[in-house]
């Protein structure tokens, strides 16, 4: 007598099969090779971090997107990373600690506790490159050009590039500084995520 085990993946979780898996792997290598050619150095951050410090300055936003659980070994709360960019910032600030310009790149899995408004999947592969210690306009242009090159290598057409500035956001938020802390934080997050529905709830 045999029994059939019925199984399914969690909502928003995908797996890659042939030939798609090979296509994704080849693209990952192609992107990293492009970054290496521009003198970016590879880092491999851990997929797990302490919940109390994950995300650094963006802690609240990053943690709100992370799966968290208690570590059976230490009893501390751990989180699965939902983003690698903030990990790169942490590595530059606390591990490398260089006074020189630092250029890092990475590729790895990220897991989010909920799907975004853009992507159905909660598990994705994030590939990126970051420049630290160089506030010049040349560094900004290098980052933008590298991003556009990455999009080109990915075979994505009809791209729209939105460029923001922290000073502009601060100017927009200035009239709402009298809101209580919770409402102001919600407004700031809605602007960051470009969520019209959330904005309408706060600003009729």
Describe the role of every protein-language-model region.
Residues 2-204:
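Extended, charged alpha-beta segments that form solvent-exposed binding/catalytic grooves
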């Amino acid at each position: 007598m045999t029994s059939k085990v019925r199984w399914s993946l969690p909502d928003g979780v995908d797996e890659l099969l042939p030939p798609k898996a090979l296509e994704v792997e080849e693209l990952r290598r192609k992107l990293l090779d492009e970054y290496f050619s521009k003198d970016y150095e590879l880092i491999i951050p851990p997929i797990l971090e302490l919940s109390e410090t994950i995300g650094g300055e963006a802690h609240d936003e990053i943690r709100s997107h992370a799966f968290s659980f208690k570590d059976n070994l230490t009893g501390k709360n751990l989180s699965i990373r939902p983003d690698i960019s903030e990990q790169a910032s942490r590595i530059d600030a606390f591990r490398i600690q260089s006074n020189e310009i630092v250029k890092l790149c990475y590729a790895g899995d990220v897991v989010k506790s909920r799907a975004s408004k853009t992507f159905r999947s909660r598990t994705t592969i994030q590939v990126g490159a970051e420049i630290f210690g160089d506030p010049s306009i040349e560094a900004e242009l290098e980052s933008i050009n590298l991003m556009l090159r990455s999009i080109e290598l990915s075979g994505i057409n009809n791209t729209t590039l939105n460029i923001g500035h922290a000073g502009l956001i601060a100017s927009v938020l200035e009239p709402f500084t009298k809101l209580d802390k919770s409402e102001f934080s919600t407004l700031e997050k809605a602007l960051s995520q470009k969520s019209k529905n959330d904005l309408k709830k706060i600003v009729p």
